[in-house]
């Protein structure tokens, strides 16, 4: 699915035309949520599997997800994503934040509540019945969290399948790292607002212990010298995310 990219993926796809039943679809740039929905509408089959253009699924990725659907045919399945550029500290930190979120939100793998869209598979019928991703989200920042919450709030289950591995090659600089987390904060505002409206309550943030645990998390995963640098970047990411959240909130207040 080509969401209005400046470099056409046509040449990459052509090498598989004689090997796989594959189609290249395209649209004017509308954001990842709209692009996934567009691709899903043209997909054939009972299940949909999503990944991103900077990801490399393992050779057994689809087979592993298919085996998961044998056991959980009505559930959304999400696999494990690993950092494909381990020598990049910013990319390492960004993936470690996701790893922490999986640890926090998915203590029971068969009752997961958060799965990222770069390693996600769902029953097509239920995906379409829910309306797919919310296409109002124009940037890659929280649209998967919103879909997961909508899925669970309808009584559907999500299952974490760590054997379904995708490698993520997202090279970051200090500038793109902080921009990414600023956008995550923007997305978090809309997610929290949707979460609150769905439950007819006020917008609530996580408790302080959630953010403190995120800062401590690298020390349980890495050598102390590298963990300190990662923890410092996580603090910076939290500041950037908070800035994005309150920036988006202020814009909404001004619009009112």
Language model feature labels by segment:
Residues 83, 103-125, 138-142, 146:
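A recurrent flexible, glycine/aromatic-enriched loop bordering the glycosyltransferase active site
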Residues 48:
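Short aromatic/hydrophobic "clamp" motif used to bind/position activated sugar donors
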Residues 158-243:
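Active-site-adjacent helix/loop segment of glycosyltransferases
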Residues 1-26:
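Acidic donor-binding segment of Leloir-type glycosyltransferases
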Residues 27-43:
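Glycine-rich, basic loop-to-helix element that forms the pyrophosphate-binding segment
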Residues 56, 113, 128-160, 164-167:
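Donor nucleotide-sugar recognition loop
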Residues 21, 25-32, 56:
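Short, acidic/glycine-rich phosphate-metal binding loop used to engage nucleotide
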């Amino acid at each position: 699915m080509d969401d209005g990219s400046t470099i056409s993926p046509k040449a990459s796809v052509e090498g598989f035309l004689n090997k796989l039943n594959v189609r290249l679809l395209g649209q004017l740039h509308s954001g990842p949520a709209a692009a996934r929905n567009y691709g899903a509408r043209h997909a054939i089959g009972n299940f949909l599997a999503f990944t991103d253009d900077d990801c490399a699924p393992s050779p057994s990725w689809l087979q592993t997800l298919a085996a998961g659907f044998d056991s959980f045919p009505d559930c959304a399945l999400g696999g494990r994503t690993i950092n494909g550029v381990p020598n990049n500290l910013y990319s390492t930190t960004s993936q470690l934040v996701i790893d922490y979120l999986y640890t926090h939100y998915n203590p029971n793998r068969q009752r997961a509540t958060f799965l990222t869209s770069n390693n996600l598979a769902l029953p097509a019928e239920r995906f379409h019945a829910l309306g797919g991703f919310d296409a109002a989200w124009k940037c890659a920042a929280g649209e998967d969290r919103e879909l997961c919450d909508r899925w669970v709030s309808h009584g559907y289950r999500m299952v974490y399948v760590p054997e379904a591995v995708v490698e993520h090659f997202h090279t970051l600089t200090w500038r793109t790292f902080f921009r990414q987390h600023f956008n995550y904060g923007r997305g978090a505002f809309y997610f929290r607002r949707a979460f609150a409206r769905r439950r007819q309550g006020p917008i609530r943030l996580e408790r302080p212990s959630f953010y403190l645990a995120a800062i401590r998390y690298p020390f349980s995963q890495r050598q102390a010298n590298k963990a300190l640098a990662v923890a410092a970047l996580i603090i910076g990411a939290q500041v950037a995310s908070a800035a994005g959240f309150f920036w988006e909130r202020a814009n909404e207040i001004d619009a009112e």
